[in-house]
C-alpha cells in the first residue's frame, strides 16, 4: 500500500493503477480480538438471570436448549457446517471486520484445523509479518502457573479469557497468576479477555508486566450487569483492544461493539476520545497481536486492509462510530475488495453475489484461489437458506443425529464445528489455576434429556442490525443491561 495526499502524483509503483473516487472516508479494517464465531448464527439470548462468574450461565437449562444444543446439532450435521462458516464470515465482512478469531474445525479422522476464508484469522495467518496468535492452552498449562508462563514466553500473543465475572472467584483467576517467588505469570504476550473482576491494583500489575486486555462491554453487561473498569486500565497504561464476543450475548460485529464502548465511556465520563475508541479495533489491536508493522493504520508499506464509510464527516472518528452497516461502501482485505457497493466493486473486477443490507444494494466477492474445501463456492444466500431451514427443524435434525449409527457416522469424511465455549477436555480457553478439574464446565454438565426432546425451532440471526427489526426490542428486554445502553444504541445506527 502507498499513501499520498489528495491531488499528489501517483507513486512510481502505481502509475498504471486506476484512480477511483470512493466518495467516502477510508479507515483501517476492523480487528476483532475476541469472537466465538461458531455460535454467531444464533440470535440474542434473553439472559435468564444475573450472573457473577462465567462458570454459572453455561449450566442453565436455557443455555443447552438455545445455544449449546442448536450449535452442536448444526455443527455435526453434514451440509450445515459450511453454511455456518460462510454465514458468520460474511457477518464480519458486512460489519467492516477484516480480522477475527478463527473458526476451528474437527474431522472424524482426528484432525483439528482452522478455517481459512477471506477474513483473516488471528490463529493461522500464513504470513511472516503477521505472527500467529494463540487462543487455547493445554490442560496442564491451564492448571499450572509455571507451565502457563512457559507458554507465554513462547508465544507472540496469547488471547485468553481472564477474570470473567464480578465475584471474588472470578478475580482469583487473575491473582492465581502470581508465582511462589512473588513474580507474575504475565508477559507482553498476554491479552486478557474480559477482565471484569480486576481491581485498580490488578491493572497496575498487568501494565507493569506488559500485559494487555480485550474489552467486550455489551456481553459483560448482558451477563453480569457490569463491565471491566477500563478507566482504571487506562490510568494504569494497559493497552485495550475490543472484541464483540458472540451474537447470543454480544454485538453482531465489531461495528456494534465500538458503539457500545463509546456509550459506556461517555456514561462513566472515562475520557476516551472517539479516536482512542476506534484505535482499540485498529492500531491498538494490531499492537496487541504484534502486527503493527503490517496492519492497524493506513501507512505506506502496510497491507491494504481497509474500510470505506460513505460520506465525509468533519470528525472522521465520530463518522465511523456513528455509521450503520448501510453506510459501509467498501471492505478490502489484503488489497482484494470483498464487499461494497456495485460502483466501487465493479471498478476492481468481478464479484460473485448480490446482497441487500436493508435498502442498500451490495455485491460480494468471496472467490479465493485456494478456497477452503469445506466451504468451496457456497454463496451467502445459499448459506442463509440452509441455516434458516436447519434452525427451523432442529428437533428433527437432532433425532437424525441421535439415531445415526456410529459406524455410519465414522465412515463419512466430514468436518464438524469446534464449539470452543465448551472447552474440549484436553484444551482450555481460560486458566483454571487452583480449581479441581471436576469443576470444569465441560465435566460438570449433568446428563439431561435427549436433544431432540429439548430443542425447539429457532430463527436465524440476521447478519446486520440494519436488517434485524427485533434487535433493539430484544436489547430493551434484557434485564441486566443498563437502560442507558439500550436507549442510546439505536441513534448510533
What residues fall within each predicted segment?
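A general structural motif
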Residues: 166-173, 191-199, 220-226, 247, ...
Amino acid at each position: 500500500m502507498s499513501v499520498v495526499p489528495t491531488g499528489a502524483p501517483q507513486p512510481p509503483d502505481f502509475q498504471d493503477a486506476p484512480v477511483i473516487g470512493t466518495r467516502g472516508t477510508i479507515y483501517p479494517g476492523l480487528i476483532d480480538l475476541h469472537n466465538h464465531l461458531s455460535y454467531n448464527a444464533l440470535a440474542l439470548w434473553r439472559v435468564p438471570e444475573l450472573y457473577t462468574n462465567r462458570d454459572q450461565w453455561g449450566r442453565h437449562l436455557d443455555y443447552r436448549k438455545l445455544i449449546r444444543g442448536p450449535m452442536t446439532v448444526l455443527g455435526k450435521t453434514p451440509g450445515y457446517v459450511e453454511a455456518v462458516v460462510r454465514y458468520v464470515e460474511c457477518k464480519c465482512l458486512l460489519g467492516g471486520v477484516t480480522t477475527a478469531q478463527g473458526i476451528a474445525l474437527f474431522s472424524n479422522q482426528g484432525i483439528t484445523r482452522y478455517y481459512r476464508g477471506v477474513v483473516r484469522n488471528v490463529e493461522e495467518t500464513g504470513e511472516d509479518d503477521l505472527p500467529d496468535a494463540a487462543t487455547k492452552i493445554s490442560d496442564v498449562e491451564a492448571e499450572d502457573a509455571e507451565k502457563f508462563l512457559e507458554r507465554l514466553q513462547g508465544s507472540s500473543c496469547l488471547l485468553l479469557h481472564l477474570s470473567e465475572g464480578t465475584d471474588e472467584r472470578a478475580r482469583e483467576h487473575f491473582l492465581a497468576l502470581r508465582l511462589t517467588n512473588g513474580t507474575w505469570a504475565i508477559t507482553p504476550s498476554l491479552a486478557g479477555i474480559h477482565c471484569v473482576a480486576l481491581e485498580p491494583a490488578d491493572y497496575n500489575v498487568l501494565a507493569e508486566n506488559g500485559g494487555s486486555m480485550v474489552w467486550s462491554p455489551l456481553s459483560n453487561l448482558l451477563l453480569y450487569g457490569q463491565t471491566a473498569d477500563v478507566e482504571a486500565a487506562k490510568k494504569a497504561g494497559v493497552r485495550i483492544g475490543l472484541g464483540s464476543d458472540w451474537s447470543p450475548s454480544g454485538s453482531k460485529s465489531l461495528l456494534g461493539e465500538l458503539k457500545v464502548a463509546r456509550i459506556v465511556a461517555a456514561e462513566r465520563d472515562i475520557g476516551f476520545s472517539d479516536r482512542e475508541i476506534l484505535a482499540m479495533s485498529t492500531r491498538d489491536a494490531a499492537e496487541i497481536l504484534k502486527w503493527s508493522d503490517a496492519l492497524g493504520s493506513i501507512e505506506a508499506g502496510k497491507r491494504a486492509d481497509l474500510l470505506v464509510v460513505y460520506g465525509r464527516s468533519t470528525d472522521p472518528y465520530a463518522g465511523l462510530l456513528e455509521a450503520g452497516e448501510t453506510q459501509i461502501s467498501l471492505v478490502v482485505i489484503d488489497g482484494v475488495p470483498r464487499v461494497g457497493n456495485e460502483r466501487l466493486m465493479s471498478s476492481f473486477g468481478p464479484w460473485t453475489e448480490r446482497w441487500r443490507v436493508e435498502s442498500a444494494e451490495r455485491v460480494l466477492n468471496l472467490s479465493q484461489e485456494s478456497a477452503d474445501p469445506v466451504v468451496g463456492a457456497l454463496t451467502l444466500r445459499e448459506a442463509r437458506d440452509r441455516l434458516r431451514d436447519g434452525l427451523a427443524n432442529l428437533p428433527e435434525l437432532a433425532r437424525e443425529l441421535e439415531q445415526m449409527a456410529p459406524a455410519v457416522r465414522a465412515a463419512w469424511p466430514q468436518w464438524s464445528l469446534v464449539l470452543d465455549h465448551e472447552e474440549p477436555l484436553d484444551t482450555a480457553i481460560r486458566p483454571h489455576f487452583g480449581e479441581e478439574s471436576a469443576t470444569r464446565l465441560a465435566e460438570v454438565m449433568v446428563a439431561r434429556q435427549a436433544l431432540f426432546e429439548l430443542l425447539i425451532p429457532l430463527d436465524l440471526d440476521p447478519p446486520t442490525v440494519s436488517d434485524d427489526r427485533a434487535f433493539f426490542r430484544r436489547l430493551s428486554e434484557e434485564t441486566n443491561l443498563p437502560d442507558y445502553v439500550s436507549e442510546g444504541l439505536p441513534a448510533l445506527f
